[in-house]
Amino acid sequence: MPRACLLTPPDFCVLWRSAAAAALMLLLGGWVFAQGLAFSEALLGWMEREYGVAARDRVIELQELIAASAQISESGRLERVNAFFNRVSYDSDYALWDQKDYWATPFEVLGVNSADCEDYAISKYFTLISMGVDEDRLRITYVKSLTLNEAHMVLAYYPSAEAEPLILDNLTGNIQPAGERTDLVPVYSFNGADLWLAVNRMDGKKVGDADRLSLWQAYQAKLMRQMAVGQ
């Protein structure tokens, strides 16, 4: 059964870092966010060596899903991406990676065919960007699940700047407006550029650059290394 996950609430005194380091990470990470996921024969070979033939085939399926998206409406892209990753089984970071809080890339998720809540949300984020969805419409959102009384992470999609966001969640196959998810209390959200503290279920107050989140910095660098295999 899908579960929320044991995320650690952000300590914003620790998350801030120097402006020079932030600028460097923005330069390194810009290509990832502008272009989305990149696939190559070298990457597929690495997947097979690391995780086996079935994992390689899952990455090919993701590649084909992205390639087919040009003929699909944006709402259709949301539905397909949500369904694609929600079929991956849930497990904790301790069980999967022997760590308290590990953010797995989409390739690692498909490698082990299992994920914690943040892995679902971030994998959906990068896949939708790869399909041409504007990054400004997407926010990876840290919430508290009132049902499970646990920290959780979801992906919010904003049809327009002032619109109520839609929530993509591994706990349910239904994509619902944020106002209907009374079981979730937002804490903060971010995308490739910005970081927001929650004001209500539908909006937040911008407080800086997303690169001030240390896990996000490490995630960007790791994903770039994986996509650069063989180059």
Language-model features: locations:
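A structural boundary/capping signal
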Residues: 2, 31-231
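Bacterial N-terminal signal peptides
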Residues: 19-29
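Bacterial N-terminal signal peptides that target proteins for export
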Residues: 2-20
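A general, composition-driven signal for non-globular sequence regions
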Residues: 7-11, 29, 118
